[in-house]
Every structure is written in structure tokens, then in C-alpha cells.
Amino acid sequence: MDFYRINEEYNQYLQRYEKEKRGVTKVPNIRYTDRNKFAFGAVMQVNGINYYVSVSSFDKKQEANILIRVPGDEKEIKGSLRFNYMIPVPEACIERLVIKEVEDGKYRLLLNKEYQFCMDNAERIQKKANKIYEMVTTNRKQKLTDNSCAFRILEQGYREYIENVLRTKC
């Protein structure tokens, strides 16, 4: 498991795909003014499809997230992993984020702390990913399902993207 940047074109494709099939999309934006959002993964695999969860600055505890806390400073929450917004990503559409190549020193330090948290909690993260996936796909809690990506729809979009976009590029 590692930090990755997800291809913007693919992310936008999933947003359009989910909106077309569901009427709304919960696929998070990854483009921000100062830097693009990145993801941690693969947090789980379903039918050979790897899922990645965004690392977010959101700092409120919710059922579908894990707060990222800095070791030795439990009160300082650095962000969260928001599992209701995890997405399936083909290997061709991710690029490993090399922390030591990040130029902004403060941001690089934050990334190192977040990465260490994720690695120290990898098993917990994988369990949470599987639990939220199961809860959403079986509609165990309507409010959670409504506020989550439609994982099965995204899996279909993932397959269609590979078939219609990636195969034609090769």
C-alpha cells in the first residue's frame, strides 16, 4: 500500500458515469488550486478490482471514515480516510506519489506523518474499507448509501473505461 495520484481524466470519467447512471455523483474532486488530492491504497480488492481511498483534510469523526492522528499528538487530527468515497482504479490510471520529491517542506512533513499513520493502521484500514463496501452495497443504512459512491455502478464504469478507453490507447 502506498500514496497515489489518480489520473484526472479517469476521475472525471467516473464522475460523469455515476451521475449518468444514478443522477448524482459522490466521486470526489481531485483538482484543487494548490495541489491535487491523493489516495491511499489499494485498501481492498473486489473481483480483481483495486479500490483506493482519498486522503482528505476532513477532520470530523464519522462512521465511514478513519481520522488520521499524528503519533505523540493525539489531539491534532491531520485529516481522514473517507471510505464512502473510495473508488475503483485501474493500475494504468494511478501514479505513485513519491513523498521525498515533494518540494514544499511543510507539506512533505505532513505527507510523511499521514503515510506513517496509514502504514501503522493498514489492517484496520482494510477492515474498514471492506465493512463500508459491504454496508453500502447491501444498503444496510440508507443514509450511508445515499452519501456514498455507488460502488457497483463505479465498478461497471471501471470495466467500461478499460474496455473503451485504455484498450484503444494500447
Please name every model-derived segment.
Residues 74-170:
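C-terminal terminal-subdomain/extension
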Residues 15-32, 63-76, 97-109:
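Low-complexity, polar-biased intrinsically disordered regions enriched in Pro/Ser/Thr/Gly
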Residues 10, 47-49, 56-58, 89-95:
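Short loop/turn segments at secondary-structure transitions that flank enzyme active sites
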Residues 1-36, 42:
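Short N-terminal edge-element motif at the start of the domain
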Residues 30, 34, 45-83:
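Compact nucleic-acid interaction/catalytic patches
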Residues 6-7, 49, 150:
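Alpha-helix initiation/capping motif
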